[in-house]
Amino acid sequence: MTTVRTRIAPSPTGDPHVGTAYIALFNLCFARQHGGQFILRIEDTDQLRSTRESEQQIFDALRWLGIEWDEGPDVGGPHGPYRQSERGHIYKKYSDELVEQGHAFTCFCTPERLDAVRAEQMARKETPRYDGHCMHLPKDEVQRRVAAGESHVTRMKVPTEGVCVVPDMLRGNVEIPWDRMDMQVLMKADGLPTYFLANVVDDHLMGITHVLRGEEWLPSAPKLIKLYEYFGWEQPQLCYMPLLRNPDKSKLSKRKNPTSITFYERMGYLPQALLNYLGRMGWSMPDEREKFTLAEMIEHFDLSRVSLGGPIFDLEKLSWLNGQWIREQSVEEFAREVQKWALNPEYLMKIAPHVQGRVENFSQIAPLAGFFFSGGVPLDASLFEHKKLDPTQVRQVLQLVLWKLESLRQWEKERITGCIQAVAEHLQLKLRDVMPLMFPAITGHASSVSVLDAMEILGADLSRYRLRQALELLGGASKKETKEWEKIRDAIPG
């Protein structure tokens, strides 16, 4: 019998996401329940955004949760390399094969031409898609232009009529019309593959038998299915998991909920409690119990118990469940976990340089730096009273800063400062006009250690979480204000 092999393939482009852990958990449970193997693969073909630091954070975050893998970049295995950036020659081979067989073609269209074509299609109220301009170029012309160094990509051919039947383990057969599909780029101009080619090639060569991924990928499934057909390969069984959602039913996003695994670690949640909560996202134990271990989930795992209704990621329910785990610990276990969380040597070393020069004895540390060890901070609206700005302007500044920080990819002091500076300058303010608002929002005090250093240490999700708390305290933004301020946000450079 074929060994079940599943995988998770995150992109190392930012903080490790709870959605990644959610999909990893279900892939792990499915594999283990069937006596199979679970593989971790890194999708780092976005060279501008991918970093090894983010990759390591993914490893650390998943391991903190208790998720282990059988093969991967850090543990090796017989199907490596496990980083897509190290497999370029493999993708090139299969891309060329598709072109030779007439299933794909070389496209020289410039971004400007593509934008113009799409604009015309949208003006005619047509679905924007590639118009096939380069699909029938003579072979000698293609060779000549490639040899001359002209920028090009490889696109796959897709049917324009009929439907593709997508066999989904949760929904049964799903029919998707081919006229919704574009002629997908397979190899980019930089010589690296897109998601579609890399996933199909890697899943085949790594012997993946079952693919559990988020349902946001279901509409593009026909492209993957067609690639398997073109290559003549057996297709893995497909399962499209329901998306995690905010309490308002929108897709889970950092704008409405902290999404970073490291945020929950910093907040003092137990890893087994967070994993337990993710396991309850759209799935339930046969006896409906709410608290269970990873081993118990694996033992009873059955995809038929997955609910297609979008599971709500609710911070209050997670906190309640975490409390259940805490209260069932022995006093010794509780003390060990608190010590591990509060006295983490690596974290203390980040804080120490900012505190050491400001205290005369250790008893002064807690009042000065206690905000480093809490989730939210006690807020006093009077701390946001400003000599130069009225209450509406105060809320506007905080909202604009929050929005700019939400778009920040690399959480570093210089970039954080740049975001705040950009907001200040656009509003014709000075940085010193804005910083008095940042101190109470982030630290709970009118003054403290450098708030910019503090934000870098606290991390993106926790800093943004506290800014949201401050905005809520001050009344938030009305719908009218939100629309007006979004226009201002979009005009801010950077």
Curated annotation (Swiss-Prot):
Reaction equation(s) it catalyzes: tRNA(Glu) + L-glutamate + ATP = L-glutamyl-tRNA(Glu) + AMP + diphosphate
Compartments where located: Cytoplasm
Comment on bound cofactor: Binds 1 zinc ion per subunit.
Residues bound to ATP: K254
Enzyme category, top tier: ligase
Pfam family, one: tRNA-synt_1c
Annotated InterPro entries: aa-tRNA-synth_I_cd-bd, aa-tRNA-synth_I_codon-bd_sub2, aa-tRNA-synth_I_CS, aa_tRNA-synth_I_cd-bd_sf, Glu-tRNA-ligase_bac/mito, Glu/Gln-tRNA-synth, Glu/Gln-tRNA-synth_Ib_cat-dom, GluQ/Sye
Principal localisation: cytoplasm
Motif ('KMSKS' region): 251-255
Annotated residues for binding of Zn(2+): C107, C109, C134, H136
Motif 'HIGH' region, chain ranges: 10-20
Residues that span the membrane, as ranges: none
Keywords: Aminoacyl-tRNA synthetase, ATP-binding, Cytoplasm, Ligase, Metal-binding, Nucleotide-binding, Protein biosynthesis, Zinc
Keyword Zinc: yes
Superkingdom, natural source: Bacteria
A single cellular component GO annotation: cytosol
Quaternary structure and interacting proteins, as annotated: Monomer.
Functional note: Catalyzes the attachment of glutamate to tRNA(Glu) in a two-step reaction: glutamate is first activated by ATP to form Glu-AMP and then transferred to the acceptor end of tRNA(Glu).
Entry similarity comment: Belongs to the class-I aminoacyl-tRNA synthetase family. Glutamate--tRNA ligase type 1 subfamily.
Listed HAMAP family: Glu_tRNA_synth_type1
Protein name from the UniProt record: Glutamate--tRNA ligase
Species the sequence originates in: Pseudomonas paraeruginosa (strain DSM 24068 / PA7) (Pseudomonas aeruginosa (strain PA7))
This protein's encoding gene: gltX
